[in-house]
């Protein structure tokens, strides 16, 4: 297996099955972040991840981390927190602010550089990339963004400036996405944060099969219209005797 150098004259990508095992999922190098190339990548289960100033790297890891909205997990402590309804959650109200906040996370390093921000903001303006914002009063305290592929949503990054804000973003989006027929959220690589919310790993081949099926299921345009999302509904605790 070897890393493929992308041609500047073609949007073709190599098969994800040819990706390296170490580092896991590295598939190709080069190309650009134009909208046609980014969309061609997402359609094939491939995403960019690289450091600013360095060559663009393209990835398709195996296994793949995913979250089925119907299987989302809300812990007891998070349920208690959400019952107080401390946040207002919106969709596509301020994409630029969300991706800038994701780039500003120290623990994320600096991979979401200016070039990446410009590219995804362009995708947003074209109607392919979307943001979820979490507000406390008028302050943006959390959120996430990603790229829609029919009934599959490719989550790219999230941030939180106060307790549980990013969890609230993901859980509220799960319910909204499922209500419009969304079936799967791509989390790319499993981490402790998404695992606590119900994300799990599946083989890359299974992910690619689901991607092929779900990207042919377009959701109603109303799903992505700028809007305020209803508060996450959490059942009250069962009464004790």
Swiss-Prot record:
Q: Note the Gene3D superfamilies from the entry.
A: Leucyl/phenylalanyl-tRNA-protein transferase, C-terminal domain (3.40.630.70), Leucyl/phenylalanyl-tRNA-protein transferase, N-terminal domain (3.30.70.3550)
Pfam families referenced in this protein's UniProt entry, alphabetically = Leu_Phe_trans
Instruction: Please give the chief subcellular localization of this protein.
Output: cytoplasm
Keywords of the record: Acyltransferase, Cytoplasm, Transferase
Biological process terms from the Gene Ontology for this record are: protein catabolic process
User: Could you tell me which InterPro entries the record lists for this protein?
Assistant: Acyl_CoA_acyltransferase, Leu/Phe-tRNA_Trfase, Leu/Phe-tRNA_Trfase_C, Leu/Phe-tRNA_Trfase_N
Sequence similarity: Belongs to the L/F-transferase family.
Protein task? Functions in the N-end rule pathway of protein degradation where it conjugates Leu, Phe and, less efficiently, Met from aminoacyl-tRNAs to the N-termini of proteins containing an N-terminal arginine or lysine.
The identity of this protein, by name, is: Leucyl/phenylalanyl-tRNA--protein transferase
């Amino acid at each position: 297996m070897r890393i493929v150098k992308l041609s500047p004259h073609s949007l073709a990508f190599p098969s994800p099955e040819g990706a390296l095992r170490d580092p896991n999922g590295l598939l190709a190098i080069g190309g650009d972040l134009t909208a046609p190339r980014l969309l061609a990548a997402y359609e094939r289960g491939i995403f960019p991840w690289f450091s600013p100033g360095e060559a663009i790297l393209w990835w398709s890891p195996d296994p793949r981390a995913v979250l089925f909205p119907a299987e989302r997990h809300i812990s007891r402590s998070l349920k208690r927190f959400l019952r107080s309804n401390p946040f207002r959650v919106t969709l596509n109200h301020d994409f630029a602010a969300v991706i800038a906040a994701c780039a500003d996370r120290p623990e994320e390093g600096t991979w979401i550089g200016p070039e990446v921000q410009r590219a995804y903001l362009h995708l947003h303006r074209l109607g392919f990339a979307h943001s979820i914002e979490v507000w406390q009063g008028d302050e943006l305290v959390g959120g996430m963004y990603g790229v829609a592929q029919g009934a599959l949503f490719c989550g790219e990054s999230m941030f939180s400036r106060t307790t549980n804000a990013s969890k609230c973003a993901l859980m509220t989006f799960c319910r909204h996405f499922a209500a419009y027929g969304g079936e799967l959220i791509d989390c790319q690589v499993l981490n402790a944060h998404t695992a606590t919310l119900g994300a799990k790993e599946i083989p890359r081949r299974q992910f690619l099969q689901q991607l092929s099926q779900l990207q042919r299921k377009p959701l109603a345009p109303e799903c992505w219209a700028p809007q305020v999302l209803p508060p996450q509904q959490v059942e009250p605790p069962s009464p004790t005797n």
